[in-house]
Swiss-Prot record:
HAMAP family: Leu_tRNA_synth_B
Short motif ('KMSKS' region): ranges: 618-622
InterPro entries reported in the protein's UniProt record: aa-tRNA-synth_I_CS, aa-tRNA-synth_Ia, Leu-tRNA-ligase, Leu_tRNA-synth_edit, M/V/L/I-tRNA-synth_anticd-bd, Methionyl/Leucyl_tRNA_Synth, Rossmann-like_a/b/a_fold, tRNAsynth_Ia_anticodon-bd
Species this chain originates from: Shewanella baltica (strain OS185)
Gene3D superfamilies with a match to the protein in the record: 2.20.28.290, 3.10.20.590, HUPs, Isoleucyl-tRNA Synthetase, Domain 1
Record field: catalytic activity: tRNA(Leu) + L-leucine + ATP = L-leucyl-tRNA(Leu) + AMP + diphosphate
Source organism superkingdom: Bacteria
Annotated ATP binding sites: K621
Keyword Transit peptide carried by entry: no
Descriptive protein name: Leucine--tRNA ligase
Membership in a protein family: Belongs to the class-I aminoacyl-tRNA synthetase family.
GO molecular function: aminoacyl-tRNA deacylase activity; ATP binding; leucine-tRNA ligase activity
GO cellular component: cytosol
């Protein structure tokens, strides 16, 4: 065995072995329990970052652990390779998105292999290949045939100068990123999938996701946003028109003092014809992008329309205002405003001098709405026939009256909106729909799929090449001239079903149901919590679509979800001569000074610039504080990087990158190597004989088996990889102090090392593979079994009892493990130190905590 640990040499040899032997390639095996472990696949941006490394290390640890449990483990990888960054890079690098993407895939694939991740590369997929998106297109046509796909106009960001649609990321301070022209909102036809048809099931089935974090489940519940309320009809004074409003608080209906409608509401458009101020306000609202998130913080503004709504119960007229906080695409585009009991309505009413009336008060007191709205539920008053009713009774009484008079209906609403899947970009899967000469829109026939995206294109940075090339859209369907759809799919489409394609990546159909149903659902899914409401909801939705198409037989795509925390690093900058911040990589910081608590107080970079330290923040390009994993692997080895990633923090919390911690991980592996080397060179041939062990030997062996039990639980159930590593480190400390003089001493060390290399194999697989062979095992570690706890070894022959006299420790005594109180008390009382401290005192009380403590009270 080599005396020195040489990671680059070991890792290259072990990785070659895995590659040559196709170690991680798997097939379906009905006789073995399966385990499908999946980390969210990466976008091929060019290089892996530490966030990737953390995600994929966690996945690999879980997969390798399950393999040693004897399971048939699938751990695939692929590339989420469509998307806007490729278009931007292609423009900047004067190339096309395809070659840039494929080059990045090759580079990053090599990086993943250098980190030793045990992927089944035979199942690798790239979503930008026709072999993949063909089936996505096919499935979309099937959804269309089932009535789950439709087209309607929706608002997009429009650059009037370039005459092109902009993604949200391409709008900077309200202007086009390329030409700085103010961006407008434009209504264009787009394709939607009816996720709302599954809203109730998506919501209810959250309760079945026992292995998902509560935070993610709560976020999805809120995103789906089920509410029970009443949709009621308001008339318009002096007109034969009416409009609907939905509310979850019909108990406050008697306090309505005005109605707010969206700028795009038909009533606003009518009123604007004779109201120039309103017309200008509507135009302004149309050209401002307003997300729901922005609504909460932006200034609330409005203009009176001059129209009045008729209260559905009292018949009273209340003014109708057009307001910038009401969205036409959310609800009915109109809200009843009760400023006495809604803070937003209150502030708007105060601003514009509108009436504020209280109709709800606390059960046990009066209500004061002079400074703010009273938003709690309570008892109705100033509400005519409904006075004195509580929330529930008031809700029901008012709802029943509206229903009886034909002016309303009870309704369950969802915040969730249908999924708009059209993107006016080039680098995405073409949407497989065509328009015939007579204007009829139909799906592309199956025998004409895939609709190929041309890859040999020139990007001008303005228009999608398939929109600019008028010939591309021309096609024929059933002998008729037709025009292809030139929009492409939202890239969330590809990531919504990739997990299922891995089960049969080469099938000449979307999925091979037999293979899909063997592997699915995913047993462990790993990815960032930032995907909670988009990807993870679409992922669940698509699984239900696949189920209803007869392709899978489970209801949910993943049993367990682990959301790993971000990776943070120190961030430094200096101010240059132009007064701008220049962010400096932590690797370029030459010297630092720290206070007595270890906090950085001064830093200087390699060029002598004095730096401002801003603390730990998420690794990012903008702060130049990303650490290249490849640099760390070349310096310390993949196993060290993996070990640090697992040890530095619990997986769901943020991880603070500290190179001193990486060095510590490296030292630990060298200690393990040294201990194994010493053991191998001692050539011990004596087999372990537990019947001959001394009490010290039994105690050491007990530590070995306690560690096996803890690590098994920490990795397998708790997923606390950091405490698993800490337990092995503690065991190593015991082993390094242990004597190796007798054959049984060495036999225990041998048993311990055999356990340790398997316990650490999921985390540091290269060194574990090597040491397993050096320890004399005939088969490779991948074919071994996870170490099993010897329950007999955990049984203690004796216990160390702490003896206190009047609350102070005066002695420690060793007693038989099964000793009763009387014998422990007798031993304690006869200890020379205890006798000394009891001299001249009378024992008043003796308390025995079995196996731990003997407490004597005397005076």
């Amino acid at each position: 065995m080599q005396e020195q640990y040489n990671p680059s040499e070991i890792e290259a040899l072990v990785q070659k072995h895995w590659h040559d032997n196709k170690t991680f390639e798997v097939t379906e095996d009905a006789n073995k329990e399966k385990f499908y472990c999946l980390s969210m696949f990466p976008y091929p941006s060019g290089r892996l970052h530490m966030g990737h490394v953390r995600n994929y290390t966690i996945g690999d640890v879980v997969a390798r652990f399950q393999r040693l449990q004897g399971k048939n483990v699938l751990q695939p990888i692929g590339w989420d390779s469509f998307g806007l960054p490729a278009e931007n890079a292609a423009i900047n690098n004067k190339t096309a998105p395809a070659p840039w993407t494929y080059e990045n895939i090759e580079y990053m694939k090599n990086q993943l292999k250098l980190l030793g991740f045990g992927y089944d590369w035979s199942r690798e997929i790239a979503t930008c290949t026709p072999e993949y998106y063909r089936w996505e297109q096919w499935f979309f046509t099937k959804l269309y045939e089932k009535g789950l796909v439709y087209k309607k106009t929706a608002s997009v960001n429009w650059c009037p100068n370039d005459e092109t649609v902009l993604a949200n990321e391409q709008v900077q301070d309200g202007c086009c990123w390329r030409c700085d022209t103010p961006v407008e909102q434009k209504e264009i036809p787009q394709w939607f999938i009816k996720i709302t048809a599954y809203a109730e099931e998506l919501l209810n089935d959250i309760d079945t996701l026992d292995g998902w974090p509560e935070q993610v489940k709560t976020m999805q519940r809120n995103w789906i946003g089920r509410s029970e309320g009443v949709e009621m009809t308001f008339g318009v004074a002096g007109h034969d028109k009416s409009f609907d409003i939905y509310t979850t608080r019909p108990d406050t209906l008697m306090g309505v003092t005005y109605v707010a409608i969206a700028a795009g509401h038909p009533l606003a458009e009518i009123a604007a014809q004779t109201n120039p101020e309103l017309a200008a306000f509507i135009d302004e609202c149309k050209n401002s992008t307003t997300s729901e998130a922005e609504l909460a913080t932006m200034e609330k503004r409005g203009v009176a329309t001059g129209l009045f709504a008729i209260h559905p119960i009292t018949g009273k007229q209340v003014p109708i205002w057009a307001a910038n906080f009401v969205l036409m695409n959310y609800g009915t585009g109109a809200v009843m405003s009760v400023p006495g009991h809604d803070q937003r309505d209150f502030e708007f009413a105060k601003k514009y001098g509108l009436a504020i009336e209280a109709v709800i008060k606390p059960v046990d007191g009066d209500v004061d709405i002079s400074e703010a709205a009273y938003t709690e539920k309570g008892v109705l008053f100033n509400s005519g026939e409904f006075d004195g009713l509580d929330f529930e009774a008031g809700f029901n009484a008012i709802a029943n009256k509206l229903v009886a008079e034909g002016k309303g209906k009870r309704q369950v609403n969802y915040r969730l909106r249908d999924w708009g899947v059209s993107r006016q970009r080039y680098w995405g899967a073409p949407i497989p729909m065509v328009t015939l000469a007579d204007g009829t829109v139909i799906p592309t026939p199956a025998d004409q799929l895939p609709v190929l995206l041309p890859e040999d294109v020139v990007m001008d940075g303005i228009q999608s090449p398939i929109k600019a090339d008028k010939e591309w859209a021309k096609t024929q369907v059933n002998g008729q001239d037709a025009l292809r759809e030139t929009d492409t799919f939202d890239t969330f489409m590809e990531s919504s079903w990739y997990y299922a394609r891995y089960c049969s990546p080469h099938a000449d159909e979307m999925l091979d149901p037999a293979k899909a149903n063997y592997w699915l659902p995913v047993d462990q899914y790993i990815g960032g919590i930032e995907h909670a409401c988009m990807h993870l909801l679409y992922f669940r939705f698509f699984h239900k679509l696949l189920r209803d198409a007869g392709l899978v037989n489970s209801n949910e795509p993943a049993k367990q979800l682990l959301t790993q925390g971000m990776v943070l690093a120190d961030a430094f900058y200096y101010i240059n001569e132009k007064g701008a911040r220049v962010w400096v990589s932590p690797l370029d910081v030459a010297t630092t000074e720290k206070d007595d608590k270890g906090r950085i107080t001064k830093a200087i970079d390699k060029d002598g610039n004095e730096l401002v330290y801003t603390g730990m923040s998420k690794m990012s390009k903008s702060k130049n504080n990303g650490i290249d994993p490849q640099v760390m692997v070349e310096k310390y080895g993949a196993d060290t990087v993996r070990l640090f990633m697992m040890f530095a923090s619990p997986p769901e919390l943020t991880l603070e990158w500290q190179e001193s911690g990486v060095e510590g991980a490296h030292r630990f592996i060298k200690r393990l190597w040294k201990l194994a080397n010493e053991h191998v060179n001692q050539a011990n041939s004596e087999a372990l004989d537990v019947s001959t062990l001394t009490s010290d030997q039994k105690a050491l062996r007990r530590e070995v088996h306690k560690t096996i039990a803890k690590v098994t639980d920490d990795i397998g159930r708790r997923q606390m990889f950091n405490t698993a590593v800490a337990a092995v480190m503690e065991l190593m400390n015991h082993l390094q102090k242990a004597p190796q003089t007798t054959g049984q001493d060495r036999a225990i060390i041998g048993e311990a090392l055999s356990a340790i290399v398997r316990l650490l194999y999921p985390i540091i697989p290269h060194v574990s593979f090597n040491l397993w062979n050096e320890l004399g095992n005939a088969s490779n570690i991948e074919d071994s079994q996870w170490p099993v706890v010897d329950e007999a070894a955990l049984v203690e022959d004796s216990k160390l009892i702490v003896v206190q006299v009047n609350g102070k420790v005066r002695a420690k005594i060793t007693v038989a493990a099964d000793a009763d109180k009387e014998s422990v008390e007798a031993l304690g009382m006869s200890d020379e130190h205890v006798i000394k401290y009891l001299d001249g005192l009378t024992v008043r009380k003796v308390i025995y905590v079995p196996g731990k403590l003997l407490s004597i009270v005397a005076n």
